[in-house]
Swiss-Prot record:
Catalytic activity: Hydrolysis of terminal non-reducing N-acetyl-D-hexosamine residues in N-acetyl-beta-D-hexosaminides
Pathway note: Cell wall biogenesis; peptidoglycan recycling
One function term, GO molecular function aspect: beta-N-acetylhexosaminidase activity
Claim: Mitochondrion is one of the keywords in the record: no
Function according to Swiss-Prot or TrEMBL: Plays a role in peptidoglycan recycling by cleaving the terminal beta-1,4-linked N-acetylglucosamine (GlcNAc) from peptide-linked peptidoglycan fragments, giving rise to free GlcNAc, anhydro-N-acetylmuramic acid and anhydro-N-acetylmuramic acid-linked peptides.
Designated name of the protein: Beta-hexosaminidase
Principal location class: cytoplasm
Marked site (Important for catalytic activity) residue numbers: D179
EC class: hydrolase
Family label: Belongs to the glycosyl hydrolase 3 family. NagZ subfamily.
Keywords: Cell cycle, Cell division, Cell shape, Cell wall biogenesis/degradation, Cytoplasm, Glycosidase, Hydrolase, Peptidoglycan synthesis
Organism: Alkalilimnicola ehrlichii (strain ATCC BAA-1101 / DSM 17681 / MLHE-1)
Pfam families found in the cross-reference section: Glyco_hydro_3
GO biological process, any: regulation of cell shape
Amino acid sequence: MLLGPLMMGLEGTRLSSEERTLLCHPRVGGVILFSRNFQSPEQLRALTDAIHALRRPPLLIAVDQEGGRVQRFREGFTRLPAPGVLAAVYDRDPAQARALSHDMGWLMASELLACGVDFSFAPVLDLGRGVSRVIGDRAFHSRPEAVVHLARGWVAGMRDAGMAAVGKHFPGHGSVAPDSHLELPRDPRARSALEGADLVPFRRLAGDRLPGMMTAHVIYQAIDPLPATFSGYWIGEVLRGELGYEGAVFSDDLGMAAAAEAGPLPRRARAAMEAGCDMVLLCNHPEAVPAVLRHLPDPDPVSDMRLVRLHGRPVVDNWRKLHRLTRWQEAVRRVRGQDPSPEGELEV
């Protein structure tokens, strides 16, 4: 059975009978988890085991676990600082900053994999230019080359733990002020301006064969009239064509306000797939899932080949064994030595 094109959210900490039925639909390919789905590492493992047991090959299980404001699982997990704390370290000592980024990526990935989560939508490849509050300290740095350097460390840490990385939000969300969860951002710059700035990390990481990319719900109005998620130009011509990207392309959540440009939820899902996405996310609208499934295409063998590469391959798949590792203990100590993360949670 191939992985379908929809990644859907769940309502609680256990699967309902209705969710079990939906997750067996051939056009479903994955689940994205949030803090509402989490109580403890033990409960999380029971949930992921139940999801993975439904199908063969198993459904993908993902989460946004970046650190700082975007860390869905907290109780029992290492509290990761926001990636932006690495900017000051990088400015003093790039090698130390990359080593810390590697630690953060490895620690995040190891803990998730030990609980049965396949991958995190990370790292953020946007520039932290002080323009976008929703990106803010989720970004590594304001300078493209620094973002590339630090992101490569983070991705290598994830890979060492057995997790595939997914960069976001292509082709760059850090230079627009509006929050795409609430409204549709519009970037007025010419393509040449993006080439020397926001596009640099995506171009470089695409060349590194990053396994996954997530698109931005942003219109780059001097370049293309559609948000990147629904744009054949951005996904087909630029990402696949110019950048030669061969990994899986994910839409950002289709329930966000910025995605309304494409119409009702079923139409949004279809438009994102027609633009070139391999999988679309519907995180917070369970009532819309049946209609969305009716509008989605059947699973595609090429997309399936891209998506199955995101299944977790944990080096350590047991929570207690992980905590006994000297490497885990030392990584926790180094990461906790960084600046404290801001309180609160950003729902993205």
